[in-house]
């Protein structure tokens, strides 16, 4: 994947302002609320019975932070995203059996969360760069699937 200097700048400038805990928790909560079938991968997380329960669930918050922290590794390694996510791809494929389509859904939700948090700073050009990034990350995570 080729990244232009402008794309890299747009991605890193937003990433530098992201509150990983808040945005990660919000993104994962939105995934579980908007696409309820994804909840089956989080049965051990406890109460996921309503939007309020999901948004307040400490396990959702903690895992959301973990997910977005990993996403930060992509931002730091834009030229080697496949390598960066090789182990996570194997884990999600072979051990957790996560539907790889869910990576695309979460990526799209992350773009929505960033747009909501950054408003006019999240320009269409910025959105395009982030949309490209979430697609590349989703593809890297789905790589170990057969």
From Swiss-Prot:
One of its GO terms (biological process) is hydrogen peroxide catabolic process. One of its GO terms (cellular component) is blood microparticle. It holds the Pfam family Globin. One of its GO terms (molecular function) is oxygen binding. Coiled coil: none annotated. Red blood cells. Heme b binds at residues 63, 92. Keywords: Heme, Iron, Metal-binding, Oxygen transport, Transport. SUPFAM superfamilies: Globin-like. Transmembrane segments: none annotated. Residues 2-146 form the Globin domain. Belongs to the globin family. Heterotetramer of two alpha chains and two beta chains. Involved in oxygen transport from the lung to the various peripheral tissues. This is Hemoglobin subunit beta. It comes from Streptopelia orientalis.
